[in-house]
Amino acid sequence: MAVGAARFVKLLFFRKGNMVADNVVLQVEGLCFAYPECGVLNQWSVALPAGLALVRGDESSGKTTLLRLLAGELTAQAGRITLQGVCLSDAPTACAHKVFWVDPRSGDLDKLTARTWLDGLPARYPLWDAAALAAHTEGFSLNEHLDKPLYALSTGSKRKVLMAGALASGAPLTLIDEPVAGLDKPSIQYLARALTSVAAQPGRLVVVAHYEKLAGVPWGTVVDLART
């Protein structure tokens, strides 16, 4: 991969309790990705068990790019991503219901009301939890916003709608980017409780990209991204 004066991300990761390989939900091997103007990942590998994983790094460290690669929204130049023993690139359609990802910066959903978007998710995610959605809707104080189009919501309210759907999806791999942007303190506190609850779900990995740990969240794995 030729990338001029590329700068790549190096990986440091820490696991709580020395978790063993037989609990691995997501395996990434030799991942390489570069934009035309810069390199991002070079022979990047990690194994993540069920639970909560924090991808931590400063702005432009590659956090969002990594989530988009894991979601299949970007295609790596090399490497392999395996979810629950299945290579995602070998069976993208079959695995679509196993991965939840919505880029909070995208405007693709903006014309939909929050309710319409949420109502469409159970058909895609067989492990959808309607009771969890009701709890998240209440916890994030979203009831008054459900019939508004997403473009009419504040940054924080839109993120809360997306996270409510993500957390209720039951997807074995759930990807959440910069979760606290625009959130008020009560919503951040509820998010910590919701993530703590999700952490106990067997066989499910929730990957959160953020620049620091969220207080009160039982992170099982912390992956630090740093430019080299």
Please state what every model-predicted region is.
Residues M163:
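Hydrophobic anchor residue at the start of the ABC signature
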Residues P149-G156:
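Conserved ABC ATPase signature
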Residues D177, L183-D184, I188:
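ABC-family nucleotide-binding domains
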